[in-house]
């Protein structure tokens, strides 16, 4: 979720949902052979974030779907699981939604920060590193329009979510920003509702969301310079990460903050 400053206290909210094309469709749209239907996304919600500001839901933002695209990282997208001639077993789509909010309608909360959030009924059923299956999907962006009017950082490229077994991964989740902000990257726990984290299975965590190569077994110190990369490394200043996946058919959750 990101936001774009339009004028005065008017903002556009931008939401992207990433869909596994082997799973249900979104809003009756998407490629692949699945006939099941996923959740419809029609609105985002607004809540204050501190006790002094009552820490509660205060409204909603209507969302309009603007389109979707196949972002599977292969040369012939039509051969992905999202395409019409699927010979590759995987496929990922990005589905885009937007809405607008005028914070002049919330002047009774002047000085308060807000979470703009979405809440969906279920996650992908194939995720196998979380302690409980098919928990709710909750995600948010923080904004305080009373301090200054500006746009949030935005991601430059779609996330890399498909990794090859025993092949080194050197990638990154990069953002652009024009406000001279200091950007820090970190991995955080997925959430199912406000301040309610989803637990990972034993040996997994937000910082170890996937099985990775470690010469000594598990929980080794990350070393991005080794060949292959050891552990799970994230550069908090640049967004670069590296690891070597060591489990077949593993589906996990990575939250970048």
Predicted features and spans:
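Long, compositionally biased, intrinsically disordered segments
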Residues: 1-257
């Amino acid at each position: 979720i990101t936001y774009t400053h339009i004028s005065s206290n008017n903002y556009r909210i931008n939401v992207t949902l990433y869909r596994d094309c082997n799973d249900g469709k979104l809003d009756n749209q998407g490629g692949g052979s699945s006939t099941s239907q996923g959740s419809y996304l029609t609105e985002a919600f607004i809540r204050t974030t501190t006790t002094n500001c009552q820490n509660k839901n205060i409204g909603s933002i209507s969302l309009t779907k603007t389109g979707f695209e196949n972002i599977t990282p292969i040369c012939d997208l039509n051969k992905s699981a999202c395409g019409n001639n699927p010979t590759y077993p995987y496929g990922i789509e990005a589905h885009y939604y937007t809405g607008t909010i005028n914070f002049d309608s919330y002047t009774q909360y002047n000085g308060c920060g807000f979470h703009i959030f979405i809440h969906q009924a279920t996650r992908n059923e194939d995720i196998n590193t979380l302690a409980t299956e098919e928990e709710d999907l909750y995600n948010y962006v923080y904004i305080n329009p009373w301090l200054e009017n500006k746009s949030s950082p935005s991601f430059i490229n779609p996330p890399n979510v498909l990794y090859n077994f025993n092949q080194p991964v050197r990638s990154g989740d990069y953002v652009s920003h024009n406000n001279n902000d200091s950007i820090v990257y970190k991995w955080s726990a997925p959430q199912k509702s406000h301040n309610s984290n989803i637990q990972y299975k034993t040996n997994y965590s937000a910082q170890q969301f996937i099985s990775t190569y470690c010469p000594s077994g598990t929980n080794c110190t990350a070393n991005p310079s080794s060949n292959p990369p050891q552990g799970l490394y994230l550069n908090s200043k640049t967004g670069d990460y590296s690891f070597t996946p060591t489990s077949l058919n593993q589906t996990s959750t990575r939250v970048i903050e």
